[in-house]
Design a protein with these regions (language model features):
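Cofactor-binding loop segments of dinucleotide-utilizing enzymes, especially the Rossmann-like FAD-
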Residues: 59-63, 85-86, 133
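A general structural signal for well-ordered alpha-helical segments in protein cores
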Residues: 17, 40, 95-98, 137
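Short amphipathic alpha-helical segments
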Residues: 42-44, 70-72, 94-96, 141-144
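Short active-site-adjacent structural elements
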Residues: 39, 66-68, 90-92, 118-120, ...
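Nucleotide phosphate-binding/pyrophosphate-handling subdomain across enzymes
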Residues: 1-80
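Active-site-adjacent beta-strand anchor residues
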Residues: 33, 60, 111, 130-131
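A glycine-rich beta-strand to alpha-helix segment
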Residues: 117-145
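C-terminal helical cap/extension that packs against the catalytic core
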Residues: 28-29, 71-127
Length: 147
């Protein structure tokens, strides 16, 4: 049997990379392995709770997942939406995503790599929210560890 204080203490020590992970507080950078609109609602709830709005959102979700649903969900909180791809050849990413979203009058910026997306996102002071597959999450983690 565990006491409530023990449970709280142990939960506070829990680290789950890529799940609502704050990589930096200044500038604010949040990383989440969100690949559908439903899980995106949880991300938005956390952002609202933290008082984070007007973000640059990086989305690295392959075409066979709900990239469009995630972008639609985040567009009200985003100043910019940057689409990117993982270096993992198992996943398919293309500029067709940008074209599909443009048909819905959702403006996005396409980048060919996670590194390029992070560089572009860092060029302005907005908070950064990075959403994508575990391969994108892994690439972001590696880049942040090197910096």
């Amino acid at each position: 049997v565990f006491s409530l204080p023990d449970i709280r203490k142990n939960l506070s020590l829990l680290h789950w990379p890529g799940r609502m992970e704050v990589l930096r507080s200044k500038p604010f950078v949040l990383l989440d392995a969100c690949i559908n609109a439903t899980s995106c609602e949880n991300v938005k709830e956390v952002l609202r709770h933290l008082g984070v709005w007007n973000c640059t959102v990086i989305v690295g979700i392959p075409e066979d997942k709900d990239y469009a649903g995630v972008v639609r969900s985040m567009k009200g909180m985003a100043n910019r939406i940057i689409l990117t791809r993982s270096g993992n050849p198992h996943y398919h990413f293309s500029q067709k995503q940008q074209e599909t979203l443009a048909e819905e009058d959702i403006g996005t910026i396409w980048t060919d790599s996670v590194k390029q997306a992070l560089t572009l996102a860092g060029s302005c002071p907005d908070p950064i929210v990075i959403l994508g597959t575990t391969s994108v999450i892994s690439e972001v983690e590696q880049i942040f560890q090197q910096s």
